[in-house]
Amino acid sequence: PSLIQAKSQYPLSYGKANYAFTLRLNDTKLLNSLLKTPITSSHAMRLTGIVRERQHELDLNVNAPDVTYKGQQIKKLLLNINSEPQGLVTTISAERKGEQGPHILINAQGLIADNTISSDISFRIPGLAPIYGNINSEASFSRLHGDLKTRLHLNPSKINFDSITLQVQPSDISYHRNYLTIDHFELSNNNQHIIANGQPSGNQNDSILVRFKDV
């Protein structure tokens, strides 16, 4: 609720039915009309799901072979959202491919509940010196003076540059009204490490302190 405050333009109804649905979208006109998005697709998209109104539960599966959003081409997109007692359990896999930006393969699992998104993201950037790893994090959302405030907590994670493994140490990054605050962002490899702290918001009084050891 902190992330999306806008009220729905469609009337809400409450029932007690259970039903399943399958939807094939040969184009994205309906999707863009509902979501106010500029999505295009060269292949048909398929949506399947089960709704249990009495329990307020939803199981949703999306298969989009090739979609483009704001110039970003996403291929082999698979999205699953399932209602569980602890929140919405989500899995997603996709391949970003195109002339703009790097080729990236991604697999992610997440839990959405109580203004918080907990996620574990595995990624791979192919090439002669591949980059791959996983990022485990928890993003929380709130409202401060009416504006969205985002806090990202990074849990221990790994990023591999070819044969070099970097450890991502626990750290916090927060953002509110163009103010980005970095609290002890650290990458380490045995005795080598890079540590960053500060506030890079563009104000002339802001600063970032970066410390290097054996780099």
Features from the language model and the residues they span:
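Interface amphipathic segments
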Residues: 1-215
